[in-house]
Amino acid sequence: MTLHVQSAVSLRPFNTFGVDVQARLFAQARNDDEVREALAYSAEHDVPLLVIGGGSNLLLSGDVQALVLRMASRGIRIVREDCLEAIVEAEAGEPWHPFVQSCLELGLAGLENLSLIPGTVGAAPMQNIGAYGVEIKDVFHGLTALDRETGELREFALQDCAFGYRDSVFKHQPGRWLILRVRFKLSREANLHLEYGPVRQRLDQLGIDKPTPFDVSRAICAIRSEKLPDPAVLGNAGSFFKNPLVAAELYATIKSQHPGVVGYPQADGQVKLAAGWLIEQAGWKGYRDGDAGVHKLQSLVLVNYGHASGLQLLNLARRIQADIVERFGVELEMEPNLY
């Protein structure tokens, strides 16, 4: 067996909240064989298996009585290309932002709006990550996953993944599919998405009237760096709450009481609200309780100022959820996976 299994390992370096909890067992899988070895070890020793990537979408509420398997596989390859587009495959353990930059350097467009999102390639399809008008589903071509129930490999095409807003089939079958590698359909011609005002405004400020995908990436990196704290400096998991979808009637009621409410009508008649606006209006922006708090510049982001426990962060999140229900009648859903 090439898999190196360690005991009693701190997970602080492996979650972006910087929560200091221990894993009963810990290993890193660099290839498919080591993934299978981890599954066999889990079964043989009757210990649960928790698979993580960059730990950027994870809230650990206590010590983990499991084998924590960190996906550490690396590799980027073009599997098919012509003069118009290319299919690029990346291993699950590839860090997301460097992968985006690698594709741009290859002259391939499509991922630039997803620049500087933390995490790994393998985790990206699980919640259909998105930003500034682009989601994974818009550039997704396929993925290879291991069925933990049968040990067999399965190929997923776009229609198999049931992608939705921060949602996919993988979130609805937790613990079954272990994503090994993902393929993206990228273009050699720029088809830029500049619908979001801040992106266009930043490009205008830079005096760029004919932006390239690189320009869009740089603009978005600058915007995200200003809005979101660096997890290496201040522990966080990015946006902690999803933007809620509400009925048009509830939106009208809220708007009558709060004319400044931010809402985006959806094709199905619902309205997507800005969770950050709701949290800020409720007075939580900049709130701090010990080392657990809400970021002073971005209400959507919960932060660990140093030694907050996962339970303290979770309790803060639940207090915010309860307050938003009481004030607006809106339920906020947490984005990070809780363990």
From Swiss-Prot:
Its cofactor is FAD. Residues 19-189 form the FAD-binding PCMH-type domain. Pathway: Cell wall biogenesis; peptidoglycan biosynthesis. The active site is at R166, S239 (proton donor), E335. Pfam families: FAD_binding_4 (PF01565), MurB_C (PF02873). Its EC number is 1.3.1.98. GO terms for cellular component: cytosol. SUPFAM superfamilies: FAD-binding/transporter-associated domain-like (SSF56176), Uridine diphospho-N-Acetylenolpyruvylglucosamine reductase, MurB, C-terminal domain (SSF56194). It catalyses: UDP-N-acetyl-alpha-D-muramate + NADP(+) = UDP-N-acetyl-3-O-(1-carboxyvinyl)-alpha-D-glucosamine + NADPH + H(+). It is found in: Cytoplasm. Its main location: cytoplasm. One of its GO terms (molecular function) is UDP-N-acetylmuramate dehydrogenase activity. The keyword Cytoplasm applies. It comes from the Bacteria. InterPro entries: FAD-bd_PCMH, FAD-bd_PCMH-like_sf, FAD-bd_PCMH_sub1, FAD-bd_PCMH_sub2, MurB, MurB_C, MurB_C_sf, Oxid_FAD_bind_N. GO terms for biological process: cell division; cell wall organization; peptidoglycan biosynthetic process; regulation of cell shape. Keywords: Cell cycle, Cell division, Cell shape, Cell wall biogenesis/degradation, Cytoplasm, FAD, Flavoprotein, NADP, Oxidoreductase, Peptidoglycan synthesis. Signal peptide: none annotated. Cell wall formation. Belongs to the MurB family. This is UDP-N-acetylenolpyruvoylglucosamine reductase. The gene is murB.
